């Protein structure tokens, strides 16, 4: 898979794309109670944070997760408005290279 450093999503675009995918698929992958909780609390405590892919993704995918091209977006709720997300609803792995649409999601169980 050949990728171009000059053809990547920005960090903001990556966050936005991951959140859009999350919203589109949440109803099929989360319990109804979790969806209600997320929707009620997101305005005050919700967020999406961008990270380099965690090492445990290697258990789920069989390709190199070069952080120049792959990002992990954690979507969930924090205890406080500016706190770290500690109630995780989904972890989204995205390829940031625009010509390689690739996404994997680990949903809350």
Swiss-Prot record:
InterPro entries tied to this protein: dsDNA_mimic_put, Put_dsDNA_mimic_sf
The UniProt entry, under HAMAP family, shows: Put_dsDNA_mimic (MF_00680)
Q: What does this chain do?
A: May act as a double-stranded DNA (dsDNA) mimic. Probably regulates the activity of a dsDNA-binding protein.
Give the record's family classification.
Answer: Belongs to the putative dsDNA mimic protein family.
Q: What is this protein called?
A: Putative double-stranded DNA mimic protein YciU
Per the UniProt record, the source organism is Salmonella paratyphi A (strain AKU_12601)
State the organism's lineage.
Answer: Bacteria, Pseudomonadati, Pseudomonadota, Gammaproteobacteria, Enterobacterales
